Amino acid sequence: MTEISRFDAYPPTLTVNPIVPADAPATEHLVWTIAQAAEERKAGDLVILKVTDVSYLADYFVICTGFSRTQVRAIADNIEKQVELVHGQLPTHTEGNSESIWVLQDFGDVLVHTFMPEEREFYKLEAFWGHAQEQTLADIATAIGVAYNAPTSP
């Protein structure tokens, strides 16, 4: 039986930077795709934690904020859509989509947490995983061999 994506009815278009060297590390490439997809939907306060040395759950956590339930859902949907297009994979598990105050997406080596501001402040994952190594998009870009120009404020 063939698995059908919920995006099959309206095929999405690739919007994240697809030009990544073929020999780029797969996990960092996945983090790059997730971060770019989140930023595309105007996610706030994007944090990337490398938890390889402190957790067996995943290699990376990507944490971001949406400022309405609609935006949280849009961020999570765009991440799923772009990861499926670029990497051909869907999350193995997703929680919180119906409430859209905290959506957790499990992509195996990368866990994505998209929060509303109040929930992010309450759970404080960055503090809980404070011993993890924080990465920037520039760090991830360097790891996969692409150029990254940080957005400038107007």
Curated annotation (Swiss-Prot):
Main location: cytoplasm
Family matches, as SUPFAM superfamilies: Nucleotidyltransferase
Disulfide cysteine pairs (residue numbers): none
A cellular-component GO term for this protein: cytoplasm
Keyword vocabulary terms for this entry: Cytoplasm, Repressor, Translation regulation
Gene Ontology terms, MF aspect: ribosomal large subunit binding
Annotated compartments: Cytoplasm
BP GO annotations: cytosolic ribosome assembly; negative regulation of ribosome biogenesis; negative regulation of translation
The keyword Secreted appears for this protein: no
Family from the record: Belongs to the Iojap/RsfS family.
Complex and partners: Interacts with ribosomal protein uL14 (rplN).
Task performed by this protein: Functions as a ribosomal silencing factor. Interacts with ribosomal protein uL14 (rplN), blocking formation of intersubunit bridge B8. Prevents association of the 30S and 50S ribosomal subunits and the formation of functional ribosomes, thus repressing translation.
Full protein name: Ribosomal silencing factor RsfS
Source organism phylogeny: Bacteria, Bacillati, Cyanobacteriota, Cyanophyceae, Synechococcales
Gene this protein is translated from: rsfS
